Regions:
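A contiguous, mid-protein "functional segment" used to position or interact
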Residues: 105-107, 115-133
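Positively charged n-region of N-terminal signal peptides that target proteins for export
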Residues: 1-4
């Protein structure tokens, strides 16, 4: 009887840690020379949320390594649901889920297309170790984020 209780408690403890939600990773690069730089070493197959302040408006990007090991980057807003304050994506399991309409996308969909509900692609360049985004682009898209209320940390 004691052995059964001990095994049950051990299983419950292991399950709690195995299925616990991962805390999202937020990165706030310091703008320099008209661009922000995201270190590839900071990214993984889980979504990282890149924060930028455009004149007090929070503009957020999603950065991830796709299944084919390419780096993906997009704006963290649902194009169909914008300007809803909840038009942003949160990772649930291996998918990104719009917090307004509930549409789901895989990490491979990040930055892949710009239509409908997909996480909107953003132009960027990359080096062997970095993804580089022009702050001019971030400033131009800031009006779409005026009502956005996604988490930033």
């Amino acid at each position: 009887m004691k052995k059964t209780i001990l095994v049950t408690m051990l299983f419950a403890l292991i399950s709690t840690f195995a299925f616990a939600a991962k805390k999202p990773k937020y990165i706030t690069p310091v703008p320099k020379n008209g661009q922000i730089v995201i270190k590839k070493s900071q990214l993984s197959k889980d979504a990282s949320y890149i924060n930028y302040s455009a004149g007090g408006v929070s503009v957020q990007l999603i950065a991830v390594i796709a299944d084919d090991n390419t780096y993906r980057l997009s704006f963290n807003t649902c194009q169909s649901c914008n300007p809803s304050p909840n038009a942003y994506f949160a990772q649930e399991g291996k998918n990104l889920v719009c917090q307004n309409c509930g549409n789901q996308f895989t990490m491979n969909d990040v930055g892949a297309a710009s239509y409908g509900c997909n996480p909107a692609m953003i132009p960027y360049t990359q080096t062997d170790s970095e993804l580089i985004v022009s702050t001019e682009i971030l400033e131009k898209v800031a009006p779409a984020f005026k009502r956005w209320q996604g988490p930033v940390d």
